[in-house]
Amino acid sequence: RDLVRSRGLGDVYKRQDYEIVEWNEGNTDLHENKYIERAYQLKKWAFVSDYVRMKVLYDYGGIYFDTDVEVIRSFPDDLLKLPAFTGIESFSLLVSPGLVFACESGNVVAKMMMDSYNRDIFENTGIDTIKTINVRITDLLVCNGFEPCEKKQTVLDVTVFPSSVFCAYDGKIRRINIREDTLSVHHYAASWLPWYRKIRLFFGTKLRHIGILK
């Protein structure tokens, strides 16, 4: 099935059997726990989203993508029949729900993630030291047998796919590398970073490309 295909601000296409839902301040309880309340007060929107996506998926089920993800191929039926699935990043080997996180309502891992936020308090210690959702979910899955490596594996009720499937960013050549099994591409717009970090990310990547070409 074709889920959603979007190029920047261009047209968005969707199948009739899928619905795109926007979650915002109007339909989200921003005082549900201390973590989300404090993150919202400090305008750390990405960290607000980290909790909200897990709660919505736990309550309703569905498929979550970051806004800079492009679905390039139909998701096969055997994938969509899984109780839950996500992917890893090639350069970090961390589980990354921003690539995709799909699950049925009542998902065990989504609930465990919600519980971890409910026990936590958001501390604005700087973008480099705040525990990201990737680190949080990877730590959780490692405690339950996950191995951070490039292989398909199922932990609890979530199947984690290698980076070629949902990431497509090749850490070795430092650019997007679409393969036969690639279903979606993460373009890494890094919307949560301040402008000076985006510049460093951009020029750092470009300089590494130059180094490879020499």
Predicted regions span which residues?
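Membrane-proximal basic amphipathic "stem/tether" segments
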Residues: R1, H187-K214
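Single conserved hydrophobic/aromatic residue that forms the stacking wall/gate
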Residues: D2-Y13
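Short glycine/serine- and small hydrophobic-enriched flexible loop segments
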Residues: V4, K55-G62, D139-C143
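Active-site-proximal specificity loops/subdomain of glycosyltransferases
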Residues: E19-Y51
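Short, solvent-exposed loop/turn segments at secondary-structure junctions
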Residues: G26-D29, V69-V71, F91-S92, G106-V108, ...
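GT-A fold catalytic core of metal-dependent nucleotide-sugar glycosyltransferases
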Residues: W45-S96, A102
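Conserved catalytic core of nucleotide-sugar-dependent glycosyltransferases
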Residues: K81-V135
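Catalytic core and acceptor-binding pocket of nucleotide-sugar-dependent glycosyltransferases
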Residues: D115-H187
